[in-house]
């Protein structure tokens, strides 16, 4: 075994702990953004993946994220490295959320069905979930999620918040 191969197997364990469907979803996501098909994500490819999730990381943030995931030190992220970074969360009952599932959650919050979540809808939904919000918490959540400043949360803004929350939970944001 070469030194690099030995280093890779130590630093980024294979993602056997992921269930089949999780591994398949993650592999599809990885392949979609591996633009040149070389089996690794460059900084630009990783940035594109993050942007597809609704995030807007700076170049420095993408660089730091890549450095944290790049277990073998080659300057890019291979599938096993991505899987190793995500597996701890996925194996604790968290699943990759597809657009249909995310839309279903969004619609549950969007009580009037107009395609936007208002502050009142957010407050009612959180209370129904057993997580009532103070006025300050509600104001902060709306301010953080409503990136275009129109006073409501669109699906795109909702998806971005959910993606950021997932990355924060992973410790990679």
Curated annotation (Swiss-Prot):
One of its GO terms (cellular component) is cytoplasm. Ca(2+) 3 binds at residues 110, 112, 114, 121. The keyword Metal-binding applies. Gene3D superfamilies: EF-hand. InterPro entries: Ca-binding_regulatory, EF-hand-dom_pair, EF_Hand_1_Ca_BS, EF_hand_dom. Keywords: Calcium, Metal-binding, Repeat. Residues 21-56, 57-92, 97-132, 133-168 form the EF-hand domain. Ca(2+) 4 binds at residues 146, 148, 150, 157. Ca(2+) 2 binds at residues 70, 72, 74, 76, 81. The keyword Membrane does not apply. Potential calcium sensor. PANTHER family: CALCIUM-BINDING PROTEIN 8-RELATED, EF-HAND DOMAIN-CONTAINING PROTEIN. This is Probable calcium-binding protein CML14. It comes from Oryza sativa subsp. japonica (Rice). The gene is CML14.
């Amino acid at each position: 075994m070469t030194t690099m191969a030995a280093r890779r197997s130590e630093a980024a364990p294979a993602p056997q702990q992921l269930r089949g469907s999780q591994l398949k979803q993650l592999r599809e996501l990885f392949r979609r953004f591996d633009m040149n098909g070389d089996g690794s994500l460059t900084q630009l490819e990783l940035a594109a993946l993050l942007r597809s999730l609704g995030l807007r990381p700076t170049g420095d943030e993408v660089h730091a994220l890549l450095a944290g995931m790049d277990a073998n030190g080659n300057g890019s992220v291979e599938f096993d490295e991505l899987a190793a970074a995500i597996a701890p969360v996925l194996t604790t009952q968290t699943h990759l959320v597809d657009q249909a599932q995310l839309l279903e959650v969004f619609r549950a919050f969007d009580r009037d069905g107009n395609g936007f979540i208002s502050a009142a809808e957010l407050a009612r939904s959180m209370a129904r979930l057993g997580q009532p919000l103070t006025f300050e918490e509600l104001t902060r959540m709306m301010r953080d999620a409503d990136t275009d400043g129109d006073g409501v949360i669109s699906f795109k803004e909702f998806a971005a918040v959910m993606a950021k929350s997932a990355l924060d939970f992973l410790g990679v944001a």
